[in-house]
A protein has these predicted regions:
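Structured domain cores in non-transmembrane regions
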Residues: 20-84
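Acidic, proline/glycine-rich low-complexity IDRs
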Residues: 2, 111-158
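Short helix/strand-capping turn motifs
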Residues: 102-107
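Short coil/turn segments at secondary-structure boundaries
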Residues: 38-40, 74-77, 91-93, 125-127, ...
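N-terminal ordered "arm"
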Residues: 1-32
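Structured, non-catalytic alpha/beta "coupling" segments that mediate domain-domain communication
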Residues: 81-97
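Residues in well-ordered beta-strands of folded domains
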Residues: 14, 36-39, 149, 156
């Protein structure tokens, strides 16, 4: 009602917010006016918030995100690129359905880590190891899986 009459009442709120219900009650004219989100900022890449998202639900999601480890935040960003659905992305993170390959610029870096961690070339003489094609192996594992780059990390999603 107030909005339609040209009177906009709003307040910047950082989530999670303990007193959110009080703030919402105040800016909604004691619950008589519709609330909407006109702007937002987030450090979580690929997190999309729409104008009429449930602010109380967003507050709960923000609390959960605040409790995530750095690795879980990296995985969350990858899942958001894959699904664009925060609830589904958080569920996948909770289940731990990912592997993070750190400091990777491309899939050849991932291939190098996979080969070294798996011991794939253990027992192969050093003079022959130099001929291994990490770029080609990286292309092959990229085709076989789902890999998302977040900053300088590549995350494999299962």
């Amino acid at each position: 009602k107030e909005y339609n009459n040209g009177k906009i009442i709003g307040e910047w709120v950082s989530l999670p917010c303990e007193g959110l219900e009080e703030v919402l009650h105040k800016i909604s004219n004691n619950g008589n006016d519709e609330l909407f989100i006109s702007d937002y900022e987030t450090d979580i890449s690929n997190l999309k918030i729409s104008e009429y998202d449930d602010i109380l639900q967003l507050n709960e999601i923000a609390e959960e995100i605040d409790n995530l480890s750095d690795d879980e935040v990296i995985a969350l960003q990858a899942y958001l690129e894959q699904y664009n659905d925060i609830e589904q992305a958080l569920e996948e993170v909770r289940q731990g359905n990912y592997t993070i390959y750190y400091d990777c610029d491309d899939m050849s870096d991932v291939a190098y880590q996979v080969v070294n961690e798996s011991g794939l070339l253990d027992g192969v003489p050093e003079t022959i190891k130099g001929y291994f094609d990490y770029e080609a192996y990286g292309r092959d594992i990229d085709i076989e899986g789902t890999f998302i780059q977040v900053d300088n990390n590549i995350i494999e999603l299962y």
